[in-house]
């Protein structure tokens, strides 16, 4: 709606201007401070200029009023125009807030957890954010592809195989074993050990077979990770292997050398990242000739940046913050614009239950399993809470609040608004088609404000995507639900003289809730279950 109004205003003003959303919708739906920016050029007061501009909008069909207030130009949209927008939305509900196809393209790499165990709650935040960003981008018309980078070549994979081998020796063959300082533990390792022993037999379990054992376990873990993601309604387009990039390492090193991005010292090859803003240079090839994790990651990012996407986005854990300058430095040395590599950081999550820290899973070792939380509160509640705060801020929540059936549970509260609307339609014995002819002229000021809020969803979605601030969507839904409940409690609907106008208004509110929830990966309920 905002873009439509902007274009209507621009037809009259014929210049560039900023269009703002005043908090008090009783004053105006939209406002522009244009008069202030013209004051110096025209050598007139902002109030005089605003009054002059307001006079140009007399008898405009879109606006109920256009007023000059303290130098601002305030616009109130007419009921007739709001009704036209409502009719468009209700006639084509599947296209409500959808954007036209755009030329911009994105590649999002996210989750990319080591395939050495099940996903934990820390992985879940970035996973939910990335999946919602994907849904939103595609809804708005962008080409948006997703990818999972499988770290299948490093020491972590070897440790997975070693951990299983030691578990077999200790728990099945009853041998005395000495565990290294770093290894994987938890019931899932014992389960893998048991399954591997049944599959391969006793003779297989020797050090020379650790790589084969690790590969087998890695594949099992990838299947489990995909299941964990699907449980939370997350699907990633493609999975790419770290190993598949090793053959391209030499060519990448040559390119870096050509651009003076690397040098040799102390028998190692260093990335000269301090030249590009990093705090120090980084080793990419060790003394023994083995590449570091950074080396493989540079090759992978070089490939991503070469595929023709307008922007490559990564979602990383907040502990990778220091990794950003070195990766951007490498991309600049390779001739790419590092601004086209965008990094979103997912901060830590603290989980409580009844006010106490949530118990760690014995199955996972010392982590809270993502699947355990989904089993307990459902994927809808999990997704909502992870989207409720900016991704790069610490999140603490008590899962007990998400099991309550009252206003303290935002998922319940918003769903109750949606279900309540269906209940009102049922009580009135009507369907949406029965109220499409309503013209909304009888709506009071609160009703108009609620209608405006419901129709303003697309502006919220655009802002949320452009700022990567997905918390704007649940914030919007909470406010919309609160305003709906308040309006419902203050106005008689069924049997009132303006029943059809109110039902049409409510149908717009329901459509906005359903659309926004769908983009969050949440199902809007038509009926509340108790």
UniProtKB/Swiss-Prot annotation:
One of its GO terms (cellular component) is cytoplasm. Gene3D superfamilies: Arginyl tRNA synthetase N-terminal domain (3.30.1360.70), HUPs (3.40.50.620), Isoleucyl-tRNA Synthetase, Domain 1 (1.10.730.10). InterPro entries: aa-tRNA-synth_I_CS (IPR001412), Arg-tRNA-ligase (IPR001278), Arg-tRNA-synth_N (IPR005148), Arg-tRNA-synth_N_sf (IPR036695), ArgRS_core (IPR035684), DALR_anticod-bd (IPR008909), Rossmann-like_a/b/a_fold (IPR014729), tRNAsynth_Ia_anticodon-bd (IPR009080). It is an enzyme of class 6 (ligase). It is found in: Cytoplasm. A motif ('HIGH' region) lies at residues 113-123. Keywords: Aminoacyl-tRNA synthetase, ATP-binding, Cytoplasm, Ligase, Nucleotide-binding, Protein biosynthesis. One of its GO terms (biological process) is arginyl-tRNA aminoacylation. The keyword Protein biosynthesis applies. CDD domains: ArgRS_core. It holds the Pfam family DALR_1. Its main location: cytoplasm. GO terms for molecular function: arginine-tRNA ligase activity; ATP binding. PANTHER family: ARGININE--TRNA LIGASE, CYTOPLASMIC, ARGINYL-TRNA SYNTHETASE. Belongs to the class-I aminoacyl-tRNA synthetase family. Monomer. This is Arginine--tRNA ligase. It comes from Campylobacter jejuni subsp. doylei (strain ATCC BAA-1458 / RM4099 / 269.97).
